[in-house]
Amino acid sequence: MAKVAIMGYGTVGSGVYDIIKTNSDKLSRSANGESVHIKYILDIRDFDDHPEKELFTKEFNDILNDDEVSVVAEVMGGLHPAYEFTKSLLEAGKSVVTSNKELRDRAFGDCPREKCKLLL
C-alpha cells in the first residue's frame, strides 16, 4: 500500500484529497498495483467537521518520521516553510510532488533530478 501525505488543505490540497479519494482504482493501477492511501494531511487549521478528521495533523514531524509515507504532495504554496519541509522530506528519501514554481525555481533549480525526486 502506497501511503501519501498532503501538506496544505486549501483549494489545491482539498482538490488533491478529492482526486485521490475519487480515483483510487486508477491510481492503484498506476502505482504498480499498490493501493494509494492518504495517511496525513498537514494544516495549521482545525477540521473538526471533516469526515476523516483523524488524518489531520499540525505536526510536520508526523510525516517526516513516518517510514510508511513515501510520497508527499506539497500544496502549501509560497517559499517558507514549504522549502524547509520539502528539503527535509527529500533528505529523508521521500518523493515530493508540487506545483509550487517558486519553490522549484528559487530553492531547487540546481538540484539534479536523479537525486531529488521532486516532481512538478
PLM region descriptions:
Residues 82-92, 99-120:
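Rossmann-fold NAD(P)-binding glycine/threonine-rich loop
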Residues 71, 97-100:
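Structured catalytic core of nucleotide-sugar glycosyltransferases
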Residues 1-91:
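N-terminal glycine-/serine-/threonine-rich beta1-alpha1-beta2 phosphate-ribose binding loop
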